Curated annotation (Swiss-Prot):
It is found in: Cytoplasm. Belongs to the methyltransferase superfamily. PrmA family. Its EC number is 2.1.1.-. Keywords: Cytoplasm, Methyltransferase, S-adenosyl-L-methionine, Transferase. Its main location: cytoplasm. This is Ribosomal protein L11 methyltransferase. It catalyses: L-lysyl-[protein] + 3 S-adenosyl-L-methionine = N(6),N(6),N(6)-trimethyl-L-lysyl-[protein] + 3 S-adenosyl-L-homocysteine + 3 H(+). It comes from Prochlorococcus marinus (strain SARG / CCMP1375 / SS120).
Length: 304
């Protein structure tokens, strides 16, 4: 008896909230999975759909079950709600091109537009500041609430002529936005080589020079030594509260007396604690903003 060798894909779909997107992308990257897309709508920022195409001959039932359970467990670490999942057998679908149709132009605030690199600029957004990104990397493209909070804050407080430092740059979207909103120069840094590569690629996509936006691999301590005595006017850091606490002792060395901090990646419930912690280090809260359960805080040095 001759067994069928028909090739097909297992298409996995999962509806999820945006605050776990970057964790899912990290998991997919660690698993070596590149055939995925995220369907989102600017009109509904609360739900988006992760779609993953898995070759049938490599992913048996047991492997698929482990894959699904890993994603559900990762979600549970952040929130309690149960996610909807679906498996579908797809015959000869060319995911390498079809996944692109699920990405759309994404307006942020009143001025910014995140535009997937292969799309034409829609006429309706022709007056916006366009940031081109390639969603094929292991980093988000601006849909996470904390990233949007940072972009909206840059829009509210454009860094005209300022020197900016972006700690933990990811895709580079915040540094690119800073330049397009008038910053003189941006120094970006990340401890993840994939982030450095993604940022470098997105710098090219946006026709920026290394003089405008430079990115390097390394720690905040490395950056502090590189910048000294050049101080940043604005320091942006979009990461988790425990990480901010680890990085905070270096903030003074990277800044000057009239610099500002823009910190996000915080839960609303953590704002009081992190603000008190930074106050001990000499920083004073100026403003705070929130979206869903996430928050952004702006601080200045506490002058006696």
């Amino acid at each position: 008896m001759i067994q069928s060798t028909e090739f097909f894909w297992w298409k996995f779909e999962l509806v999820f909230p945006p605050d776990v997107e970057e964790s899912f992308l990290w998991f997919l990257n660690m698993a070596g999975i590149k055939s995925y897309a995220i369907e989102r709508s600017p009109d509904n920022l609360q739900d988006q759909t992760l779609m993953v195409w898995l070759p049938s001959h490599e992913w048996l039932k047991k492997d698929r079950e482990e894959f699904e359970n890993s994603l559900l467990a990762l979600n549970k670490a952040f929130r309690e709600d149960v996610l909807n999942t679906k498996w579908e057998k797809i015959i000869d679908e060319d995911w390498s091109s079809s996944w692109k149709k699920f990405w759309k132009a994404d307006p942020v605030g009143s001025k910014i537009l995140i535009l997937p690199s292969w799309l034409e600029l829609p006429d309706i957004y022709s007056n916006r500041i366009v940031i081109k990104l390639d969603p094929g990397s292991a980093f988000g493209t601006g849909s996470h609430p904390t990233t949007r909070l940072c972009l909206e804050d840059l829009e509210r407080n454009p860094p005209l002529g300022k020197k900016v430092v972006d700690i933990g740059c990811g895709s580079g979207v915040l540094g690119i936005a800073a330049i397009k909103l008038g910053a003189k120069e941006v120094r970006a840094i990340d401890i993840d080589s994939l982030a450095v590569r993604a940022t470098s690629e997105n710098i090219v996509l946006n026709n920026l020079s290394q003089k405008q936006l430079s990115v390097s691999l390394g720690s905040i301590e490395n950056l502090a030594n590189q910048l000294n005595p050049l101080s940043a006017d604005l320091l942006i850091c979009n990461t988790l509260s425990p990480v901010i606490k680890e990085l905070a002792p270096y903030f003074f060395k990277l800044t000057h007396s009239y610099s500002r901090l823009c910190l996000s990646g915080l839960l609303v419930a953590q704002v009081e604690d992190i603000t008190n912690f930074l106050s001990i280090l000499g920083w004073e809260l100026i403003d705070s903003y929130s979206s869903d359960n996430w928050a952004l805080i702006r601080l200045c040095r506490n002058h006696p």
